[in-house]
Amino acid sequence: MKTLLHICCAPCANQCVATLRTEGVEVTGFWYNPNIHPFTEYRERRNCLRAYAESVQLPLIEQNDYALRPFVREVAEDIAGRCVKCYEMRLFQTAKTAKEQGFDSFTSSLFISPYQNHELMKEVAQRAADTYEIEFLYRDFREVFKAGQAYAREHEFYMQKYCGCVFSEEERYLKTNKIIP
């Protein structure tokens, strides 16, 4: 089975790739993350992923749309509910690309995170699969999250401190009282 794996970052991807390869899945990575801001953060995560992909011979498709304005426009009306829009943007584009490029299925490294809303992501991914008539390969990768983080530290990957959007970065600092609201 040929699967297109949407990748948010190398620390999340490494154990997803390893798990899928162990299952005999032929994995190709897909970088599409218009939610990641600022540009320096976007570039750092993308470059780390490129290095990781090369080191494990992971084919990588990049859709380098640094899209601050379109992303903010998409989520501005409901900042608190932005995650569903973010999942939709990335998972629908992954399904579309997978279909267009002849893959059997798609999935995402987002499913490794204990911090993401798995049920919501599954629902969005299934809608994307139905829309583009391609299989959504669901795997709950959370059990290998810690192994992925350990691998990332061992290989000196860039380790981000927030999910990617400027709003999650703001929340990170508000929770630690590092900025004044």
Residue ranges and their predicted role:
Residues 1-181:
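Nucleotide-activated chemistry modules centered on ATP-dependent adenylation/adenylyltransferase
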